[in-house]
Structures are given as structure tokens and as C-alpha cells.
């Protein structure tokens, strides 16, 4: 089986690691030169903030809803990604880093649900970054399972099997 571990709202989550006062508050991360929205917390998503929206068109919405905005900090995101991937490397013999916030892992553990839950706990505890884990027989199915796992915030793990 293959697990896809995907960091939740990665850039926004990285900002929150160093600003715990922003937990459960709406935040967005803006592109270079603060041009448009490139990352949102779940709270900002619920307020209707869309990816790619020009920031200047949303300034009033940001102020009215007390949405905290951040300029991109790619050095921070790269460092946090390395920390997450280091944990994942120690959790599987085979890992394929897919993007800055996603990796596929080969699962050797028979109890896949416990494996996924333990991965989530370890990454959150050691980095402060929340992740979702989708597990299935192929990478494509693991990606689908991960999408479903994101809807189950409590466990954050979904296993797609026969």
C-alpha cells in the first residue's frame, strides 16, 4: 500500500507555527509583492476567500473580517518542508517527495489506520504542521484517499481499499 501525506494549508500552517495566537483565526498568504492570494486557512476559505484573488480587491474584506495577511516566506516554507520530509523519511523505507508539502510513502505496517494516525501525530508534535494521510494501492488512489481524509479532520486518515 502507498500513503500520500499532504500538509494541510501548508503556507498558512507554517505561519501559524510561529504565531500560535492565530490558531482558529482566518489568515491568507499573498504572492510575491503581495499581488494575490496563494494560501488560505480553513477559516479564510469559509469567508469566501478564493485562491488567486487579487489582494487589492479583498483589502476591505480582510479588514472587516480581521483576516491576517502574510507576504510569502519561501525560506520558512522550505525549512518547514525539510523538517516534515525528514520525519517521513524516518517513517518508511521508501519515500517519494511529490512537492514542497506532499510525499508518497510505501506502507509496510499491517495496521494502516494506526500507521496513518501515528504519522499525523508525529509530524504535528515535532513540527506543528497538520497533515492528512490517504492510503491506497496506487499513487492516484492514495491522492483520492487523501482528498477524502481532509474532510475527516478528527482522524485525518482515510484508507481506500477493496
Give the positions of each predicted feature.
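Gly/Gly-Pro- and Ser/Thr-rich, intrinsically disordered tail segments characteristic of DNA damage-repair
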Residues: 1-162
